[in-house]
UniProtKB/Swiss-Prot annotation:
Protein name from the UniProt record: Golgi apparatus membrane protein TVP23
Family as reported in the entry's similarity comment: Belongs to the TVP23 family.
Organism from which the protein derives: Meyerozyma guilliermondii (strain ATCC 6260 / CBS 566 / DSM 6381 / JCM 1539 / NBRC 10279 / NRRL Y-324)
Top-level taxon in the UniProt lineage: Eukaryota
Disulfide bond annotation, renumbered to this chain: none
Bilayer-crossing regions: 63-83, 89-109, 157-176, 180-202
Presence of keyword rRNA-binding: no
A Pfam family annotated for this UniProt entry: DUF846
Role, per record: Golgi membrane protein involved in vesicular trafficking.
Record membrane topology: Multi-pass membrane protein
Entry keyword set: Golgi apparatus, Membrane, Transmembrane, Transmembrane helix
Lineage of the organism: Eukaryota, Fungi, Dikarya, Ascomycota, Saccharomycotina
Residue segments, region Disordered: 1-39
């Protein structure tokens, strides 16, 4: 298991909107306008929260890919019935497969990298020391520069939906068993497997990146201390 570094552009918090009222305006007796954003984050609407995202387009696609497969699974047959009365199950199944695959790819390659600065992939390497031609499965983790700004809204939405979607699929799987919908159960098992794979991989990637950054910081401080002590011109 190894880790590599990928250069991801630095994110900076968005500037305060021009119409926002600052503390000095309140002291001067200025009245807040109705169109101004409330300075209390706890009272923000979902639209206001999403506007504070560092990558709003990536965040919207991430939310859509996470939620849409579940909604289509629940309500898809109803809406497909308005389009065609034949082969509804086949069309419903194909649409779900495409959405689940798109969600897996988007989360693994786009959303994780932009929203939280993490990415992972799997490699199969040949074991040179093996005489039987064996291969080993290697998980490779990438993390952004520790100095990169991670937007708290992006991070919270990312981790909430990362762990929340597998739970929803498990509940739907239990309902499919109770209804004897075993063909749908196969699709749900695939969705659970892919969701758990991403959840496990990003959890390990996050822990590995934090441990790597901690070790790097410790070594840099230790080497700096040793060099300063060995330097005869260093001030004491």
């Amino acid at each position: 298991m190894s880790s590599q570094y990928t250069a991801i552009e630095s994110d900076v918090p968005q500037a305060q909107p021009a119409g926002a009222t600052g503390p000095m305006d309140n002291q001067m007796g200025g009245e807040p306008n109705s169109g101004q954003i409330n300075s209390d984050p706890s009272s923000w609407t979902w639209i206001q929260r999403l506007k504070q995202s560092s990558h709003p387009v990536a965040l919207l696609f991430y939310i859509g890919f996470r939620i849409l497969p579940i909604e289509i699974y629940i309500f898809g047959n109803f809406f497909i019935g308005f389009i065609t009365k034949k082969n509804r199950f086949i069309l419903h199944f194909i649409v779900l497969v495409l959405l689940i695959s798109g969600d897996f790819w988007n989360l693994k390659n786009v959303a994780g990298r932009l929203l939280v600065g993490l990415r992972w992939w799997n490699e199969v390497n040949f074991i040179e020391s093996s005489s039987t031609g064996e291969f080993e499965n290697v998980w490779v983790f990438e993390s952004a520069d520790p100095s990169r700004y991670i937007n708290p809204i992006d991070s919270k939405v990312f981790w909430t939906l990362l762990y929340g979607q597998p739970v929803a699929w498990i509940v739907l799987g239990i309902l499919a068993v109770l209804k004897f919908e075993f063909l749908y159960l196969i699709l749900i098992l695939i969705a659970i497997f892919l969701s758990f794979t991403n959840a496990l991989a990003f959890t390990k990637c996050d822990k590995f990146g934090k441990a790597n950054n901690l070790a790097t910081g410790f070594l840099s401080r230790a080497s700096g201390t040793i060099l300063s002590r060995l330097n005869p011109f260093a001030s004491r």
